[in-house]
Amino acid sequence: MRNNPVLPVSDPPLAGENDSDGKGVDDRLFKGSAMTKRGAYAALSYMACAVMLVLFNKAALSSYDFPCVNVITLFQMVSSSLFLYALRRRKIISFTAADSFSIDSASTFVPVKTLFHTLPLAIAYLLYMLASMASVRGVNVPMYTTLRRTTVAFTMVIEYMLTGQRYTRSIIGSVGIILLGAFFAGARDLSFDFYGYGVVFLANISTAVYLATIARTGKSSGLNSFGLMWSNGIICGPILMIWTFICGDLEKTINFPHLLTPGFMVVLLCSCVLAFVLNYCIFLNTTLNSALTQTICGNMKDLFTVGLGWMLFGGLPFDLMNVIGQLFGFFGSGLYAYYKIIGR
């Protein structure tokens, strides 16, 4: 094996494998194990990348008035696949836990049989992506924030159904505070829209299924974080390409007046790079910690996103109930992080 620099990956634990403290992986599934230093770095990296990505996407969609969200997602997905291809060809990364970098053919990066095995994850990812985009249009912003915060509850239920994962009372209590904060944040705007509610809850369910499926698919397929990202791109990329063509988004993109301006290209490039890093952090965070931890991190980064977005882009009306709800949500997320660090 050549002496190549290898990027850190999250390899799926093998059945019966022991970790560094001598305990089997399965023995810790139902306990409030403390977050490792590597897991903490993964969580912090995700939050930093997520905030930056939202700001760059906001710049592309608002500052430049780019009309096609799906095309940005397609660019990000294609860019991620190209990054993975280049890194794998140069043998800087591997796609499996036991990869010895002996495979030189791009066509055999991930066997077709393994791709079919990861199909449920890819479908969950595509549904999560499309439902999340549609949900923004279905309800107003306060209600959207309120309903999306309930994803933590969906994640706990889905994790229990798929993996039997259970949590301590401390963790459940912190999640309850987050849900209370979500209610306060949208309490002034509880207008009922059946279609809008349905789309947002579909986005919540698909998000929970996607996050819970990451660790499960990684363990059963033998793929690490990069391998799962590659499989997602190979399966979802062509589907999203066809979808954007049918919707007419590709034609709108070609006719976009700022498409080749340096400023827009820099914003789009940064968005694609950050999306690649963010997807890697999501896989790493979900595998090293849990799907629920990933969801909680998403709630914590909302506060920084709202603050930076208000300072850079403005347009955020002040509402005391919304502020109280945001603080409740941040407090609950902080409690969750504290309990994970001390192992309760």
UniProtKB/Swiss-Prot annotation:
It comes from Arabidopsis thaliana. Disruption phenotype: No visible phenotype under normal growth conditions, but mutant plants have increased levels of high mannose N-glycans, decreased levels of complex N-glycans, and are insensitive to root growth inhibition by salt stress. It is a multi-pass membrane protein. It comes from the Eukaryota. Its main location: Golgi. It is found in: Golgi apparatus membrane. One of its GO terms (cellular component) is Golgi membrane. The gene is UGNT1. It holds the Pfam family TPT. Mediates the transport of UDP-N-acetylglucosamine (UDP-GlcNAc) across the Golgi apparatus membrane. Delivers an essential substrate for the maturation of N-glycans and the GlcNAc-containing glycosyl inositol phosphorylceramide (GIPC) class of sphingolipids in the Golgi apparatus. InterPro entries: Sugar_P_trans_dom, TPT_transporter. Belongs to the TPT transporter family. UGnT (TC 2.A.7.15) subfamily. Keywords: Golgi apparatus, Membrane, Stress response, Sugar transport, Transmembrane, Transmembrane helix, Transport. GO terms for biological process: UDP-N-acetylglucosamine transmembrane transport. This is UDP-N-acetylglucosamine transporter UGNT1. Expressed in roots, leaves, stems, flowers and siliques. Residues 1-23 are annotated as: Disordered. The chain crosses the membrane at residues 41-61, 66-86, 92-112, 114-134, 167-187, 194-214, 226-246, 264-284, 304-324.
